[in-house]
Amino acid sequence: MSQRQLAYVFDLNKCIGCHTCTMACKQLWTNRDGREYMYWNNVESRPGKGYPKNWEQKGGGFDKDGKLKTNGIIPIRADYGGTWNYNLLETLVEGKSNQVVPDEKPTWGPNWDEDEGKGEFPNNHYFYLPRICNHCSNPACLAACPTKAIYKREEDGLVVVDQSRCKGYRYCVKACPYGKMYFNLQKGTSEKCIGCYPRVEKGEAPACVKQCSGRIRFWGYRDDKDGPIYKLVDQWKVALPLHAEYGTEPNVFYVPPMNTTPPPFEEDGRLGDKPRIPIEDLEALFGPGVKQALATLGGEMAKRRKAQASELTDILIGYTNKDRYGI
């Protein structure tokens, strides 16, 4: 059991799908040495199949009795999409081709269904869902590892893999219900998001948090009652875990999208009264607390429109870096 737990809150109402977080992580951690296909941080469009493809259907996690599920499916290479080779030499140097193309026809990738969403115009909808390792309090990957290579850091609760102990059995890949454990074929070991702990140890925020241009990411210790994590998760209860039913007690929380876009049109062309993003779709991701969270958010926004003060909206705006993260 770790002494303290670092956690994240992602405000989905502010995410613009720019992937700056993804590129920050990719350039720092996964652009070499067998990690090229890995995206420890990814931003997927929902509704959608996600990354790896259909990760929600691959099992893992714990059952209702708290027992580790052993029926998880290891994603195949195609589920992640290609890291294709291109004819750069022939095109840019030798002049044998006038077009840069991949060496094989792409059929899937990390953002293959980006911005597709669900529904038909003018009632279609989608939103962005950034995902990293949840650094769970009850990690299924840790429970599944027979060599005890996976552990939670005592000082901050980050879940990491001891590469010297990992034997490459991939039980952890099967066990993670979020599809955030990866296998490095070049090294023969499992790897994952490390919460940027080398940066954390220097007092710096993780790269994905620091580089977020939409300022959607909040980061800090769960028990810091003066910090944004505690206030959004425990005090205001507007930040919810993703698929809490998996039983891993994730430490990444999401402020659900508020349906502030116009409601869908009725058949006669008039605006209806139903939310554009169906509440049941949001509850399938974030659980039964969605309605109350949205009601709280809506109420606080209404106060601001009346020029009244709102601590919650001030927190969510996150005027400065210090307002959004720090340890």
Curated annotation (Swiss-Prot):
Its cofactor is [3Fe-4S] cluster; [4Fe-4S] cluster. [4Fe-4S] cluster 2 binds at C25, C193, C196, C208. It holds the Pfam family Fer4_2. GO terms for molecular function: 3 iron, 4 sulfur cluster binding; 4 iron, 4 sulfur cluster binding; electron transfer activity; metal ion binding; selenate reductase activity. [4Fe-4S] cluster 1 binds at C15, C18, C21, C212. [3Fe-4S] cluster binds at C145, C166, C172. Its EC number is 1.97.1.9. Residues 6-35, 124-155, 157-186 form the 4Fe-4S ferredoxin-type domain. Gene3D superfamilies: 3.30.70.20. One of its GO terms (cellular component) is membrane. PANTHER family: NITRATE REDUCTASE BETA SUBUNIT, RESPIRATORY NITRATE REDUCTASE 1 BETA CHAIN. Heterotrimer of alpha (SerA), beta (SerB) and gamma (SerC) subunits. This is Selenate reductase subunit beta. The gene is serB.
